[in-house]
């Protein structure tokens, strides 16, 4: 066989190989033994090199290069996602109160307060005991409500790491005073004087007396014209919450917006900020703020912020620190 190549060109004489433009164009391949040539359509060569593009799992199936570019683009996006995940993992892996109070989720802490949990709190790590966790001890449910809530507070600085804990429901009902007076404010009330004794005995039995932290608290101790008018620092192990701890602000307490009922407990508990549904447990329970000469504040069973006469018997749902 002879082929006339008088008007032919060498491949190197073409500006670009793309001069062969159609899938119907052919390549003539000389057989190795010199006996002839084979005619190969360019489309067959393309299919051999690229494979079947319809089987690609990419969105773009127009060409192999387009598919490769798409994959590299996805790889870049995925790399960014992986870096973001690494940063999130690093953040969640941090220890301390700020992480414990910021990433709040409900989790079971068991049926007893363990030595391991105590060590975790005392070290200030809060890896085992985080805000949002709960214990069920002797049939009573307790919430871990705020890590290091009173750290660095007090006329004598509190330097011990701790978890503020509250019961899910009131321990029992009690009066603020036997008559409808608020004389002496919270510190001078029957509730503070004797009404919390059984609650303290209960939490000591449930968590261990050595794990209830004695610390200094600033409490209102005088009333003038129906408003709290004085305060002082006292040693304490258990107290009623105030409006700021529950709501994050005044509701009915504070009168002319004095701060005697607030004291050092000026921030909403992290648990209540994340889970306001836990404020309302379908009970009426006392707060320590003075409303008037005859009323103390309370959380109503309907969920409303309210106040009532001091001699009414409402729920006792105090807060305490464990370590």
PLM regions: where:
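Collagenous Gly-X-Y triple-helix signature in extracellular proteins
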Residues: 79-323
């Amino acid at each position: 066989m002879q082929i006339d190549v008088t008007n032919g060109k060498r491949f190197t004489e073409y500006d670009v190989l793309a001069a062969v433009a159609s899938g119907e164009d052919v390549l003539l391949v000389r057989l190795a033994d010199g006996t002839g040539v084979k005619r190969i359509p360019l489309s067959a060569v393309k299919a051999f090199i690229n494979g079947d593009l319809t089987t690609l799992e990419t969105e773009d199936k127009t060409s192999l290069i387009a598919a490769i570019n798409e994959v590299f683009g996805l790889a870049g996006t995925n790399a960014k996602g992986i870096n973001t995940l690494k940063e999130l993992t690093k953040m969640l892996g941090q220890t301390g109160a700020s992480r414990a109070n910021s990433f709040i989720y409900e989790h079971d802490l068991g049926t007893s307060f363990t030595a391991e949990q105590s060590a975790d709190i005392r070290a200030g790590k809060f890896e085992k005991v985080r805000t949002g966790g709960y214990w069920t001890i002797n049939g009573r449910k307790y919430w871990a409500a705020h890590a290091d809530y009173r750290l660095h507070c007090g006329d004598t600085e509190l330097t011990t790491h701790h978890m503020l804990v509250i019961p899910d429901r009131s321990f029992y009902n009690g009066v603020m005073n036997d008559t409808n007076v608020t004389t002496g404010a919270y510190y001078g009330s029957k509730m503070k004087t004797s009404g919390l004794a059984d609650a303290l005995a209960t939490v000591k039995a449930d968590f261990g007396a050595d794990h209830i932290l004695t610390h200094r608290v600033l409490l209102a101790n005088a009333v003038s014209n129906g408003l709290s008018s004085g305060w002082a620092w006292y040693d304490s192990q258990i107290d009623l919450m105030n409006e700021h701890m529950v709501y994050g602000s005044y509701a009915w307490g504070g009168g002319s917006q004095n701060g005697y009922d607030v004291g050092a407990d000026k921030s909403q508990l992290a648990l209540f900020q994340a889970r306001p549904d836990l404020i309302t447990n379908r009970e009426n329970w006392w707060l320590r703020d003075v409303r008037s000469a005859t009323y103390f504040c309370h959380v109503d069973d309907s969920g409303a912020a309210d106040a009532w006469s001091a001699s009414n018997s409402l729920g006792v749902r105090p807060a305490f620190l464990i370590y």
